[in-house]
Curated annotation (Swiss-Prot):
Native organism: Halobacterium salinarum (strain ATCC 700922 / JCM 11081 / NRC-1) (Halobacterium halobium)
Record-given protein name: Large ribosomal subunit protein uL4
Name of the gene: rpl4
Cross-referenced Gene3D superfamilies: 3.40.1370.10
Primary role: One of the primary rRNA binding proteins, this protein initially binds near the 5'-end of the 23S rRNA. It is important during the early stages of 50S assembly. It makes multiple contacts with different domains of the 23S rRNA in the assembled 50S subunit and ribosome.
Keyword terms, alphabetized: Ribonucleoprotein, Ribosomal protein, RNA-binding, rRNA-binding
Amino acid sequence: MQVTVRDLDGDDAGTLDLPRVFEEPVRPDLVKRAVLAAQANRTQEYGADEYAGLRTTAESQGSGRGMAHVPKANGQGARVPQTVGGRKAHPPKAEKDHGLDVNDKERKAAVRAAVAATTDSELVADRGHNFDDDVEFPLVVSDDFEDLVKTQDVVSLLEALGVHADIERADEGRTVRAGQGTLRGRKYQEPTSILFVTASESGPSTAARNLAGVDVATGREVNAEDLAPGAEPGRLTVWTESAVEEVAQR
């Protein structure tokens, strides 16, 4: 399978033989398992205070008084779950393991399947990405891209490739998050847009980090969640020639 390599002006800069990983069968089931496991394994432990609801002098009066055995303090029920300010019956435990296990072979197969999904224009469109009708997938650019340090240069490249509309979609879709996250440094929600896969992350990351919804990863470290956010394969991805060679070894 061959693909056209584009230069920084979007012009034809030759062809490249794609490795077999780009022809792997797309397995949404494996991709979903790998993504959900990655999300679960970075979940922060949480649980109730060991003494929550128990900091009271309430005592039960016992039997023989014609009244409930509920512990009371100053005539008010306390401590037990059915009282105001009492403990919870079965609170979350901080020692609980929320992680999920995935076999190594399945995890690697999920990455290969997610890589192959980036070659399917229908899957990319189904994820909601915007691009010109004449765009050919996968998108491969020359290694000159890795030398870019200015955001405007990246914007010019995306316009030449016919995929800048996806950046605009993500920018227009930015909304204020509902709930307590707005008070915890997560005020805005932003749609996911383009993923750049390169051999070196430093230069492209600096140039592209201010673009809405953009992520940068290396071919050696890109994972299933990078390629399939929300466990939906087919993310709009721009590869460099060197990154294609790196991902071939996955």
